[in-house]
C-alpha cells in the first residue's frame, strides 16, 4: 500500500484505497490528483514526494468525497500548495459537513460526522483561475457526484476518478454510489469512446483498455434498476425498498451504508420515475412507489 507506480514518462499513481495521481510537471514540481482519505494518507504522500525530491505545486481534486480530499488540509498546511476544484465540489471541499448532511438529508448525527464521510476543510482555487496549469485538460465526469471531473495529462494519461468501479467491488457490493443515474450513464458512454495511453481509475486497475469494465459498470446499473422495479411491483415505501435491496445483495447495514446506499437508491427512484417506469403516490401519509 502507498507504493509509487509509474504509468508513463511523467505520470505515476500512489496505490492506496483511492488511487492518488502524480503528474511531474518538471524535475522539481508535481501535481497530485486527489490526496487520500485523511491526514495519515497526506503524511505518507509527503514522504513519497520528499523521497523523490519533488515539491508539491498543487492538488487537483476530482471531486469532494472524503476519501479523495482527506489529505488536502495536511498537505496544504505543510506545503502551502493550492487545491483546485470546481462547481459544487469546491463548496463541499470548503465546507465538508455538506457531504454527510447531503447524504443523510438533514443534520448528521455523530455516527456520520467522521473522516470517512467528512474530511477536514481546505482552501480552494477554482479550475478557471489563471494559475491552473494550462497543459492539463479537465474532463467533466458527472453522475457519481455533482461536478466530478477527470484529468488528461500532456502525455495522454487520463485519471478517471470514481466513474468506474472494479469488477471485484461491483461483485461484492453491487450498489456503487451514484448521485445522478442519467448523468452517470452518459458519462459511461463518453468514457467508453475515450482514447488514452493509459487510464487510471481511483477504484480499479490502471489499464490502456477499459471498455469491458465500462460495460460491466453499465450492466450493473441496469441490473440494480431492474431489482428495484421488481421490489416495487406492489406499492412500497422507501425504507422497505432499501431493506429489500440490502437483503437481496447480502449487504450489512450500519449508519454509513444506510446513507450511501440509501442516497443511491433514492437516485434510482428519481431516475425510474422521470423515465416513466415508476409511479409515486401518497397514501396514509406515506410516499409509496410502484412499478408502472
Model-derived features: where do they sit?
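Divalent metal-coordination and catalytic microenvironments
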Residues: 10, 23, 34, 49, ...
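Conserved beta-strand hairpin/beta-sheet module of binuclear metal-dependent hydrolase folds
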Residues: 1-52, 150-161
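Active-site HxH/HxHxD metal-binding segment of metal-dependent hydrolases
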Residues: 40-132
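A structural signal for the main folded, soluble domain(s) of proteins
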Residues: 22, 29, 41-43, 57, ...
Amino acid at each position: 500500500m502507498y507504493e509509487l507506480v509509474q504509468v508513463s514518462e511523467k505520470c505515476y499513481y500512489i496505490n492506496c484505497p483511492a488511487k492518488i495521481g502524480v503528474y511531474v510537471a518538471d524535475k522539481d514540481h508535481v501535481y497530485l490528483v486527489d490526496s487520500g482519505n485523511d491526514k495519515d494518507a497526506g503524511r505518507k504522500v509527503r514522504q513519497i514526494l520528499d523521497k523523490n525530491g519533488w515539491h508539491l505545486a498543487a492538488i487537483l481534486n476530482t471531486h469532494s468525497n472524503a476519501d479523495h480530499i482527506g489529505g488536502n488540509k495536511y498537505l496544504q498546511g505543510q506545503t502551502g500548495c493550492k487545491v483546485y476544484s470546481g462547481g459544487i465540489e469546491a463548496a463541499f471541499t470548503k465546507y465538508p459537513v455538506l457531504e454527510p448532511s447531503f447524504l443523510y438529508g438533514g443534520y448528521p448525527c455523530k455516527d456520520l460526522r467522521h473522516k470517512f464521510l467528512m474530511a477536514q476543510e481546505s482552501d480552494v482555487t477554482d479550475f478557471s483561475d489563471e494559475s491552473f496549469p494550462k497543459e492539463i485538460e479537465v474532463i467533466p465526469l458527472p453522475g457519481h457526484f455533482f461536478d466530478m471531473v477527470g484529468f488528461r495529462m500532456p502525455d495522454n494519461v487520463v485519471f478517471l476518478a470514481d466513474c468506474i468501479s472494479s469488477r471485484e467491488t461491483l461483485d461484492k457490493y453491487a450498489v456503487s454510489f451514484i448521485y445522478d443515474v442519467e448523468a452517470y450513464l452518459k458519462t459511461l458512454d463518453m468514457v467508453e469512446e475515450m482514447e488514452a495511453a493509459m487510464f487510471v481509475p481511483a477504484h480499479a486497475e490502471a489499464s490502456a483498455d477499459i471498455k469491458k469494465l465500462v460495460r460491466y459498470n453499465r450492466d450493473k446499473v441496469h441490473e440494480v434498476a431492474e431489482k428495484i422495479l421488481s421490489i416495487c411491483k406492489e406499492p412500497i415505501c422507501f425504507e422497505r425498498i432499501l431493506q429489500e435491496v440490502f437483503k437481496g445483495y447480502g449487504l450489512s447495514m450500519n449508519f454509513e451504508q444506510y446513507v450511501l446506499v440509501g442516497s443511491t437508491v433514492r437516485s434510482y427512484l428519481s431516475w425510474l420515475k422521470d423515465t416513466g417506469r415508476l409511479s409515486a403516490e401518497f397514501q396514509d401519509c406515506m410516499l409509496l412507489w410502484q412499478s408502472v
